Amino acid sequence: MNISYDLLRSYVEMDLTPDEVAAALTSIGLEVGGVEEVESIPGGLKGLVIGHVLTCDVHENSNHLHVTTVDVGAEAPLQIVCGAPNVAAGKAVVVATIGTVLTSGDESFTIKKSKIRGVESFGMLCSEVEIGVGHDNSGIILLDAATTKPGTPAAEHFGVSSDYVLEVDITPNRVDATSHYGVARDLAAYLTQQGKATKAKLPEVLPAPAAGTACPVPVTVAVDETLCPRFEGLVIRGLKVIESPDWLRRQLETLGLRPINVVVDVTNYVLHEFGQPLHAYDLAKTGGALSVQLAREEKMVLLDKSEGQLTERDLVIASATGEPLCVAGVMGGLDSGTTETTTDIFLESANFNATSVRKTARRLAVNTDSSFRFERGLDPNRTTWALMRAASLILELCPGSYIDGGRFDHYPVPAQPYEVTLRPSHMDALIGKFIPRDEAARILESLEIEIVSREEDAWQLRVPRYRIDVTREADVIEEVMRIYGYNNIELSGYVHANLSPKGANDRSYSRRILLSEQLTGAGFNELLNNSLSSEAYYEGLTSCPADKLVQLVNPLSSELNVMRQTLLFGGLSAISRNLRRQQKSFYYYEWGNCYAAAPEVERSTATTLAGYRETQTLGLWVAGARIQSSWAHADEPASPFELKAYVLHILERLGISERSLRAEFVECDLFTGRGYSYATYDGKPVVLMGQVKSALLAKWDIDIPVYYAEINWDNLNRLAERVKIEIADLPKFPVVRRDLSLLLDEKITFAELAETARRAEKKLLRDVTLFDVYEGKNLPAGKKSYALSFYLQDTERTMSDKQIDAIMAKIRKSIEDTYGATLR
């Protein structure tokens, strides 16, 4: 939020420099991100002087240029070539001398000695646009030579001033500080603590018309006080909507706002001055009445010319015919604002429900200065002053305008201050230092916190309603501490430390980092997707059934209305997005939680909700080119076997043997054909992988194969917890390899063959690998050929041929007897 140093000084007396103000605000919790000098005219007219044109002759080589001599208060006049049609001898002009830097928008250029059509020029005569003092570019600026002196700095003549803008980072709980007066209030408390007692002050305003007298515009509030705690306004007639005076325009421009007209500018000024949003309705467009009501299912064009789709949950201010004029707390409608033809307005100062404003603003994708404040919760007691401040300024700046009738004020349940009990002894304990009681009381008073009663260890406090962040004793203690000064609280002479062994959660986190580094090193990129998903993704799926989805009560949109059951869809979105950007390789991984409704789950810990299951999950996506074409390689696409290899590498890195898991093909409608899974022998799922079904890929316009593996990290991590590190000598005797080529039923898997071989030879069989698979011609129907390698090793001696042959015969017989296999 931008804070003007000059405007801030109008609310609190101080002798601090802008940098000192920034340091002071940061020390009390209003962090200042930067301080920038802002000049009323960009560039400050540096290098520009007033000159008198002594002579003006037509350029000998051009019929539209003139060669002038200009007195700029130097020893000799300057020769300057000028193309402006209104240049003439005897005129006073603005001269940019050599070396002057002129700024035009975001660009700047330096005036240099030049030669124009053969004639030397030692400067430039300037127009309003070229130096930023106006919009006339038809000719150069002409001044009265009788009242100006050559050599006078242009900055002095035009009254250039400068201000400083402080960029204050407001935390979400400090809505009271989202205005100049709010910041001034905190700064006054700081100064008082530094021994410079002062208070923030507001300018005088017109007295508010009585709320009981009739307002000439009927207003109906058709919602309860929850949605609209207060709605206040009055009618101003006889307006002539003109351009704002220079001081108001400059102030808004300093804050980064664009001046529009005097009425709109005043409402924006008061918003930044006091923090209360306002809105002015052109009475000619209201139909003679206003209504605060819930919208219909309708569209509305907003002031920024965007079209918003309203729902029955949106609060609006409507005309006599029910047409929405303004989205409450967010933005006005394009057809309700004030223009140069406006003569009568209804000036609104209201308080709307923070949650309602936030939901509407998010759904409409609109973020305004008004919604920024309403979303954080405003004090309904402060609408009247803001209303009268704006009315006072409008009447002052628009002569002939007047307030017609009384003030409408719908305030059914007045907001009360917060009642808090402070125990000074608890304050000392929490801060870690004794705070003198009178000093604590002075700090509270400087923050406008009233001490109703003050017993020895029980102070009854009344906190202003605008301090929505101070509702508990701990909040009050924090307020005392920040004004007392964090730097004034000494460190304790004792050092306290807690040492605890590394727990299961720490070990799980370490394993996650280990695997992330492994995957990143293998060429994967990590994804970070939203846990919210679209219900439409799950339609018709049995593996992720819609009746197991966790629905959001108040979704931001229909595309983010459920919690995800699988990580798959987030990865498909990433692949689709990058595929459209001509990427070729898609190797992704993501850590995330998946959610499902599970009525059988009972609450067991503080973080476990009854009826829901939350699973930590690791997702892997492999798609596109594994190796992209080059002089050394042809394109090589990703394959399901590559994905399986990465999964096995993960298991291996955690010390988990593939043999300790049950591998099988499973039916899964996420995949083409069947999926492949690993599970514990007691049935707990660990890995599910396969080729994503083309019908799913089509939803994301993906036309390449995608292979996906989803790892249940909760179950895998439990297995890793049971792994023990074993240390063994390096083998001293050679490994022996023997191969078998087998003809068997096509439904038999390699994992089944490997497990059968290990059961047949438990001691000396070290590994089994598959090096060839063949199906097709020259084989009986329903058969396939597997070529397997068996690795044998004895750690105590070199194996003999007789011993090797006996083991291989035993393995072969076991496979033949179990699966009916035959040697090829």
Give the residues covered by each predicted segment.
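Beta-rich nucleic-acid/ligand-interaction surfaces
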Residues: S40-G44, P207-P209, V270, R462, ...
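Conserved mixed alpha/beta core segments that line enzyme active sites in large multi-domain catalysts
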Residues: V49-Q79, R249-R250, T254, N261, ...
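Terminal amphipathic helices with adjacent charged low-complexity linkers/tails
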Residues: L187, L191-V223, C398-M427, F434, ...
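Glycine/proline-enriched, intrinsically flexible loops and inter-domain linkers
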Residues: S4-Y5, A23, I28, S40, ...
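A carboxyl-terminal module marker
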Residues: N2, E445-I449, D469, E473, ...
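Extended, well-folded interaction surfaces typified by the phenylalanyl-tRNA synthetase beta subunit core
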Residues: V420-P424, D428-F586, R738, Y791-E796, ...
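Phosphate-backbone binding interfaces of nucleic-acid-interacting proteins
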Residues: M1-A211, F346, R363, D369, ...
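Mobile "lid/hinge" segments at catalytic clefts and subdomain interfaces of large enzymes
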Residues: R117-E130, G139-L142, A155-Y164, K305, ...
